[in-house]
Amino acid sequence: MKIKTILTLVAALTVVTASRAFAHNPGGKPDPMNASLESLKGAEFEQSFLQQMIQHHRSGIEMAKLASNQTKRPGVRDFASKMISSQQEEIAKMSRWLKSWYNASPKEVANPAANKEMKMHMSMLNGKRDADFDKVFLTMMPEHHHAAVEMCEQAEKKATHSELKEFAAKMAKDQQDEMRQMKDWAQSWFGPA
């Protein structure tokens, strides 16, 4: 009886651990940007967060730009256009903070591992058209947003500038709203995942 109880507890713990890992990143593997931020705090955290979120937004913009030519759905095109506009505004704001708070400029590549992952995502989207594009885009972009939401959650806890905390909270909410929209479209057009 004791062994059965222990095995049940081990199985339950395994399920909880696996589900937390999956919730951490829906793709199942750790996000390189979030992992690199976890041990940082104070000014070092803020600089790294800003640098990496700028890189993250740039990669999201590149993915969204593909939608203007590769989907037939006006809703996806409009969604991508709005996303590009809002993320360009956020990049400008984060770049100003980097300059005024830390006398730094955005790096072209703040996280090489994330850059490599983005190139893989772009290769999966390139060449896809219409429904094939939409299906991949509506799978990958929510995962991309999920990583940004997790980065924002860290910033809400660890940032030292209150305006960065507020900015991160708003960005997380906006990206969660966009994730819901994309998941609704994916389910409506392609069925349950």
Features from the language model and the residues they span:
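Bacterial N-terminal signal peptides
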Residues: 8-16
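All-alpha RGS (Regulator of G-protein Signaling) helical domain and cognate RGS-like helical scaffolds
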Residues: 24-193
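Sec/Tat signal peptide C-region and signal peptidase I cleavage site
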Residues: 17-23
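Bacterial N-terminal signal peptides that target proteins for export
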Residues: 1-8
